[in-house]
Regions:
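Hydrophobic/aromatic-rich core segments of domains that either
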Residues: 4-77
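N-terminal accessory/pre-domain segments preceding catalytic cores
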Residues: 7-9, 81-194
Length: 194
């Protein structure tokens, strides 16, 4: 959606693919299942990415700058690799890899295959879990099944395990989502499984 909006507004933008590295062992081989957008403005390439959930970029990154770059939330940096760029976030004093970005533009069919894989493969975390993320002002909320993580700028990270009522309340208050009656059995099931 972001790519389409940027193109419609007249920006020179193209999709790039990336190998997610977030919370994975350093040498684990993973498919390129993430899409980010390269935007060219005044002969400079910028990375725009609003779809990486729990640590999504809250400002574009200048792909030519290898050092730390400030975003609305945590700093990020671009680390040159052989044929790729690694995007990292600074959390609790440590640089953590988000993903390795391939700089070759991607075709729609490749992106469709990646989307199909992460949405339907039985081993995909998105197929097995309830995952919701919202970033606003100076707070991030991430819900994975019944675990709510809240990160506020300059504050300790807060973790909470939610019961069925807490899930419903969090989805409404923290994520701004409407709840339908047929969701409640899922909330009960999730709270029992945890």
């Amino acid at each position: 959606l972001l790519l389409r909006v940027l193109l419609e507004l007249g920006f020179h933008a193209e999709p790039l693919s990336a190998r997610p590295r977030w919370r994975r062992p350093p040498h684990e081989h993973v498919a390129r299942t993430h899409m980010a957008v390269r935007v060219r403005i005044d002969d400079r390439d910028w990375l725009a990415d609003v779809g990486f959930g729990s640590c999504m970029l809250t400002a574009p990154l200048d792909l030519a700058v290898a050092g730390p770059q400030q975003t609305t939330h945590e700093p990020a940096r671009v680390v040159p690799l052989e044929g790729e760029l690694r995007i990292e976030r600074l959390l609790t004093g440590e640089w953590l890899p988000m993903y390795d970005l391939l700089l070759a533009p991607q075709k729609a069919v490749d992106l469709q295959a990646a989307n199909w894989l992460i949405s339907t493969h039985p081993a995909s975390s998105f197929h097995q879990n309830l995952v919701v993320s919202r970033t606003r002002d100076e707070v991030r909320h991430v819900l994975v099944n019944t675990r709510l993580t809240t990160r506020r700028a300059g504050a300790e990270v807060e973790y909470r395990e939610l019961d069925a009522a807490g899930l419903e309340q969090s989805l409404v208050e923290d994520f701004g989502l409407p709840i339908q009656d047929n969701f409640r059995p899922l909330f009960e099931l999730l709270s029992v499984k945890q």
